[in-house]
Design a protein with these regions (language model features):
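Outer-membrane beta-barrel "beta-signal"
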Residues: 35, 152-180, 193-204, 322-360, ...
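Transmembrane beta-strands of outer-membrane beta-barrel pores
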Residues: 35-41, 67-73, 103-109, 141-147, ...
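Repeated loop/turn-to-beta-strand initiation elements of outer-membrane beta-barrel proteins
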Residues: 29, 59-65, 93-97, 129-139, ...
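Transmembrane beta-strand segments of Gram-negative outer membrane beta-barrel proteins
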Residues: 23-37, 61-65, 97-99, 186-205, ...
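Gram-negative (and chloroplast) outer-membrane scaffold detector with strong preference
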Residues: 55-111, 225-281, 378-446, 488
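Residues on the lipid-exposed face of transmembrane beta-strands in outer-membrane beta-barrel proteins
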Residues: 35, 51-55, 83-89, 125-129, ...
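Solvent-exposed loop/turn segments connecting transmembrane beta-strands
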Residues: 38-47, 70-80, 91, 109-119, ...
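N-terminal signal peptide c-region/cleavage motif recognized by signal peptidases
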Residues: 17-19
Length: 501
């Protein structure tokens, strides 16, 4: 029943947005950050920060996705991911009524006794003030509920900030029927993007301890990093990583800004600062707030593919967690300038909202409730490098099955091919990190393979059903996986940046 209600809420958010979406030359997206403090059992307080991205489907309706992360209190590592829908109504020329609903999943530092199955529902209402080019600043009241057996039911004030930017996004991947005038082109936010697969070694400081007081060993983490270049040199970044050795269940999400310079036509140096949240796996990250500073080098193997090395210092502000880190990255960059480009470089992308069901395939697959299947809510972002081939980054979190706090991040190649009318075949080979919720993940390294059949409902909206298998590389977890997803297919027309040749 809870699974049906959760999927019904997701369908509601999508059906409100997509039919209302009118094709326009320029659309508005926004980066969003919010803060609120939840009241937990025993009057414990937990400060949470949201980082997300929203897309305006009309002047009044927006839909996006984001993550809530603990940054204050004693629950570092409490993280959720999900969908966020918003309704905005003008009250005056500079003040809007701001309301919305979020459907998410996750948990941590309290397990299923705190977050239950992991399902999180958040409703909110408030006002926001238009600061012009500085964005929107808002405040209001929210209610957060973990209804699937969780212990969190909290009402609290919140603060929020959104920074809009302009995009040229078209539904589907067909040949563009629209063009921009000079004034519209100048309003288009410049974007050169990169997606990187990251493996990072954390060399822990001698003062670092576990949350039980023991010596904290070194960690290996796997994840992805996304960059958006704001000009020739400056970039914004978002990275998410999970433990693949040392402390299974540890996860971190960092956002920040950096600066890159060209040393040769193929070699670049960069440096950046970021902050975010992390914890879990017995790591002493205090309230969860993390600071990170890094410097590195990139070498382009082809005009799009590159390899990179970076060194960083990572520190929790409220715990003993502290490490020097060394990372190796393989990445793909969009928006490469070519003599044939006319200023705009189309990027074919797809965003999927998915439900995956884990079914027991090993007697020791989890430490409790072994007879229960696990329902997971997830987001999948696909970037197509060829008409039938894509690179995907995926995140899933449990919302039913008494596995609250379970989360996984996966990356890998995918294949999509139409074979009859609107029907298409889909296959993926994924690897990544997973942990939490009592699942027997060993060091945290996992692999997953999926295959299925999809149907294109419209040129931009499709449904996909899959069957797959997921296993821990050196743990007892083994599960058969059933998946169902809804996908939005779109083309983002971007500035080609002449700095990257």
């Amino acid at each position: 029943m809870m699974r049906k209600r959760t999927f019904a809420l997701i369908i509601l958010l999508l059906t409100i947005s997509f039919p209302a979406y009118a094709e326009s030359l320029l659309t508005t997206d926004a980066l969003k950050a919010s803060y609120e403090e939840l009241t937990l059992p025993g009057k414990e307080r937990m400060g949470m920060v949201e980082l997300g991205i929203m897309h305006d489907f009309t002047d009044n309706i927006s839909l996006g996705f984001g993550s809530w992360m603990a940054v204050k209190g004693e629950r570092g590592g409490f993280i959720t991911i999900g969908l966020d829908g918003g309704l905005h109504y003008p009250v005056t020329e500079v003040i809007d009524l701001d309301t919305g609903l979020s459907v998410g999943a996750g948990g941590g530092r309290g397990g299923y006794t705190l977050s239950g199955g992991g399902l999180m529902l958040r409703t909110y209402a408030g006002l926001r003030y238009n600061m012009g080019s500085w964005g929107w600043l808002g405040a209001g009241v929210s209610y957060v509920d973990f209804p699937n057996g969780g212990a969190i039911h909290s009402t609290q004030p919140f603060l929020t900030y959104t920074l809009p930017f302009t995009s040229f996004i078209e539904n589907g991947w067909g040949k563009s029927q629209q063009s921009l005038g000079d004034k519209q082109y100048n309003r288009l936010s410049p974007k050169v993007h990169s997606l990187e697969l990251v493996t990072r070694k954390l060399f822990m400081a001698s003062t670092s301890r576990t949350d039980t007081g023991g010596e904290q060993g070194d960690l290996t983490i796997l994840g992805i990093e996304w960059r958006t270049y704001l000009g020739d040199n400056w970039y914004a970044k978002l990275e998410t990583e999970g433990a693949a050795g040392g402390s299974a269940g540890y996860m971190q999400i960092l956002a920040g800004a950096g600066y890159r310079i060209a040393l040769t036509d193929k070699l670049f140096a960069d440096t950046d600062l970021s902050l975010g949240a992390g914890g879990g796996g017995g790591v002493d990250s205090g309230g969860g707030l993390l600071l990170n500073g890094s410097a590195g080098m990139q070498y382009f193997l082809t005009p799009h593919f590159f390899a990179a090395l970076s060194a960083a210092h990572l520190k929790a502000t409220g715990g003993s967690f502290q490490a020097n880190t060394l990372a190796f990255k393989l990445g793909y960059q969009t928006g490469v300038h070519t003599p044939e480009s006319a200023g705009l470089a189309p990027a074919c992308m797809q965003i999927r909202v998915a439900n995956q069901t884990y079914q027991q395939a090993s007697d020791l697959w989890r430490s409790h409730h072994a007879n229960k299947s696990i329902e997971n809510l997830g987001l999948q972002i696909d970037y197509f490098i060829k008409p039938d081939w894509y690179i995907t980054g995926q995140a899933f979190a449990a919302y039913q099955g008494d596995a609250g706090a379970y989360m996984t991040g996966l990356v890998g190649p995918g294949f999509r091919k139409n074979f009859y009318g609107n029907f298409y075949l889909n296959a993926e080979a994924l690897a990544g990190a997973a942990g939490g919720g009592g699942l027997a993940m060993g060091s945290g390294v996992v692999w997953q393979g999926n295959a299925g059949v999809g149907y294109e409902i419209t040129p931009s909206l499709s449904a996909l059903a899959t069957l797959g298998r997921m296993e821990a590389v050196n743990g007892d977890f083994k599960a058969n996986v059933k998946g169902l997803s809804l996908a939005w297919k779109f083309k983002a027309n971007e500035h080609s940046n002449k700095a990257f040749q």
